[in-house]
């Protein structure tokens, strides 16, 4: 389990773009399960949509990408690197995410060859599928 302090040591993202609140399980270099608590105070709800707040799908995908990043950075070989979003396949949204929902984010690294990595990801709320996709990353060295 990783708290927000540990997550910030792994991911370069910060408020308002850090979309992982807690990691509840880690299978080193392979799989991560994390949580994003969606509150009524999220800035994106001011415009999406004021009278009908729905979490934008692209931010659900970003939360899944960040969860994948945590999985990739658990590998010692990837310390000091950053995963840059390189592509997405088969992305489907099945349910809206609204204030009060808790997103369960799952990412499993399926391929890691050189600087390219792929992950199967899915987000659920209370067991209901919200989103699933396959995400591709290009690993790059962080600037010194």
From Swiss-Prot:
Key words of the record: Cytoplasm, Lipid A biosynthesis, Lipid biosynthesis, Lipid metabolism, Lyase
Catalysed reaction, written as an equation: a (3R)-hydroxyacyl-[ACP] = a (2E)-enoyl-[ACP] + H2O
Pfam families per the UniProt record, alphabetical: FabA (PF07977)
Gene3D superfamilies: Hotdog Thioesterase
Enzyme class: lyase
Residue positions of the active site: 48
Entry GO terms, CC: cytoplasm; membrane
Compartment(s): Cytoplasm
EC number: 4.2.1.59
Sample GO molecular function, one term: (3R)-hydroxyacyl-[acyl-carrier-protein] dehydratase activity
Major localisation: cytoplasm
Keyword Cytoplasm: yes
KW Cytoplasm (keyword) present: yes
InterPro entries: FabA_FabZ, FabZ, HotDog_dom_sf
Gene Ontology biological-process entries: fatty acid biosynthetic process; lipid A biosynthetic process
Stated role: Involved in unsaturated fatty acids biosynthesis. Catalyzes the dehydration of short chain beta-hydroxyacyl-ACPs and long chain saturated and unsaturated beta-hydroxyacyl-ACPs.
Family: Belongs to the thioester dehydratase family. FabZ subfamily.
Protein name: 3-hydroxyacyl-[acyl-carrier-protein] dehydratase FabZ
Organism of this sequence: Listeria monocytogenes serovar 1/2a (strain ATCC BAA-679 / EGD-e)
